[in-house]
Amino acid sequence: MSKTEIPSIRFRGFDDAWEQRKLGDVVKEITRNDPESEAPIMMITANNGFIEQSERYAFNNAGESLKKYILLKKGELAYNHGASKLRPYGSCFALTTAENARIPFVYHCFSAENQNAEFMSIELNGADIENQLRKIVSSGARMDGLLNISFDEYTSVSVLLPGTEEQDRIADFFRHLDNLITLHQRELEKLQSIKKALLEKMFV
């Protein structure tokens, strides 16, 4: 059963109501692995989404568990149910920067056919989903730093889905915003480095 809702703000030209669905009704779990794969080893961070593990660690810390790593394909999604200050109820991202990636088997991975994966990740990182997860996961329910939430529990949340054209438009907009943020962050870091160098040379 589904309900429909209309968002308070949206792009001009879209008038249809958004459909409320259970996440589990529109996604399919992914558990595939390939011990022989040479795909990059990646992980999810709350700030930046998918990054290569080598960007965070100087060595491969997967060890023997690497054989169990899930092989994710471009356009598929993963939910990292590790709590962080930025995202206390975990974070979900679509793989967009590589054709394939090997990712920790503790992540909940899934495909969302007929949906825009980037749009899905935007919604699944939103405040409404966090509120729903708060009711599912006790703040004390932790195991090895992970929120104790199963795939079925995670996909029991409700999502609001517009048509695919509107999903594409929203995903494009937020991708552009993210690119602008990254660009300005790099410019800021560059200016901070210049300032530091000038201060060091002026006051010697």
Name every feature range the model reports, one short phrase each.
Residues 12-17, 108-116, 149-168, 202-204:
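Proline-centric
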Residues 25, 168-180, 184-185:
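Extracellular/lumenal glycan-associated surfaces
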